[in-house]
Amino acid sequence: MKFVLVSGGVVSGVGKGIIASSCGLLLKTLGLKVTAIKIDPYINVDAGTMNPKEHGECFVLHDGGETDLDLGNYERYLGVDLARDNNITTGKVYQQVIENERKGKYLGRTVQVVPHVIDAIIDTINRVSRVPVDKSGEEPDVCIIELGGTVGDIESMPFVEALTQLRHRAGKNNFINIHVSYVPVVNGEQKTKPTQHAVKSVRSAGLIPDLIACRCEKPLEQGTINKVASSCQVEVNQVLAVRDMPTIYQVPLLLEEQGLLRELKETLKLDDVKLSPARVSQGQEVWAKWQKIVPLGYAETVDIVLVGKYVELHDAYLSVIKALEHSAMRCGRKLNLIWVDSEHLEEKTQKEDPTKYHKAWHDVCVAKGILVPGGFGHRGTEGMIRAAQWAREQKTPFLGVCLGMQVAVIEAARNLCELKDATSEEFDANAEHRVIIFMPEGSKEKLGGTMRLGTRSTHFQPGSEFSKLRALYGEATTIEERHRHRYEVNPDYIEKLEQSGLIFIGKDDSGERMEVVEIKDHPYYVGVQYHPEYTSRVLDPSRPFLGFVAAAIGCLDQITKEILQDAGFANGSINGAHF
């Protein structure tokens, strides 16, 4: 097993996740099998109960693991399916060590950070790195490890020590450290001191950077590169200038251009890894497709409005943004995403701040498509309901995801079924017409890990042959998508809702839980209880999102026809081979 560690200094949030993902993609183009691990030093066991405004999106994996959003980047770039164990947190490690101590596994010894916590971290990395993550079912060749936060943080120290020991145990040519640092510009001059101090700090902690990736807004000057190389004891060709790019999908192209793949091959002796001609050819095909679908830019745009609750922090909807971008690229357009706070569409804002109210409604009215994503709680939902009503009545393409589907159902119940007080049990537990109810298997007391999580099957129902969404899935009868919710459509209202024109075309295994809703006589009005954004890939966009964006552009029929004709485009495959 070969390891690529991506660490960071100076400040967090400089793009370690994108650089780690890009590195993995480049290795994959050689035909190697690549997996990834994200280390988060926080004490939370997982990201399931974290506030999206503080931490960003909670990404859901196929096994129901609620993790850091960077694991979404890994899956999107590498085309793999990771599991909850691929996200290591301080909380998980200490929980494991304490449980082992309670079971007597340490035979009465004093349990300490060194060696017990350190060994637990190393053992977890070694175990998880060998778990197959693609359909080949084979052990990965390379594991990308991203160390979250910045080296030097108190909470990071056990992980730094563990990674230092892991490097020694892995042996020569089996471990490489890429250190990511920020190069600020002050009065027009690129400053290297922060990078010098960061590298000095990481060296003193025991990790020796082999490559230094300098994040910068503009290309680094040669003098700056030379200064970083000499002060950080690396060669000039081991300094990567990772400047801001028009899209993050061009970062792999930039890194390949700067010779990252050459350095990885040389340091890790990747030419010694035995690969079948089929794997090599497959890797080359992935790279060719990536280069084709990620051009410098598109002349035309598509205007999409996102009506959400957490619009102040765009990372709260990261996977939604990426799914829209993937779909726009597939349709040959650039995404112009317009953010609308759902509260600004409500009557309260009309009275208190008419300017915000009219601005929000102007954006909704002129948009080519309206998206209502997931969320929790009552705040802002009346604005979402009004946006869903506008999309339905004005024939504007609409996609509702999770909560977005639920507000579409509430809107139809109120305005088509004339149940004026229709609402969700989440918003009003005592309302007469609760068309959305709490799932019986959930828990209102224990929030962490108690939702309906992970990959579940959805079955398209007889009579759904008219469905635009079903056609986008290649006329499949059963699909698998990831879920994260506590509430569902009340079965008592299904008949009345369907009589009004809201057709529930997809249901779960029992046939009692509603998963997909669609309006027949509409350009594209779809609601899904699952989260299709979690499985969207750069080379294989999510079907609900692809249909939504294509309908907004006016090319839905063309895209659907191409999907039905191109078997290789379906199910994340190239010529039938999973990548």
UniProtKB/Swiss-Prot annotation:
GO terms for molecular function: ATP binding; CTP synthase activity; identical protein binding. Belongs to the CTP synthase family. Its EC number is 6.3.4.2. It is an enzyme of class 6 (ligase). The keyword Ribosomal protein does not apply. Keywords: ATP-binding, Glutamine amidotransferase, Ligase, Nucleotide-binding, Pyrimidine biosynthesis. Catalyzes the ATP-dependent amination of UTP to CTP with either L-glutamine or ammonia as the source of nitrogen. Pathway: Pyrimidine metabolism; CTP biosynthesis via de novo pathway; CTP from UDP: step 2/2. The active site is at residues 402, 531, 533. GO terms for cellular component: cytoophidium; cytoplasm. Residues 310-558 form the Glutamine amidotransferase type-1 domain. The keyword Ligase applies. One of its GO terms (biological process) is 'de novo' CTP biosynthetic process. The gene is pyr-7. It comes from the Eukaryota. It catalyses: UTP + L-glutamine + ATP + H2O = CTP + L-glutamate + ADP + phosphate + 2 H(+). InterPro entries: Class_I_gatase-like (IPR029062), CTP_synthase (IPR004468), CTP_synthase_N (IPR017456), GATASE (IPR017926), GATase1_CTP_Synthase (IPR033828), P-loop_NTPase (IPR027417). It holds the Pfam family CTP_synth_N. This is CTP synthase.
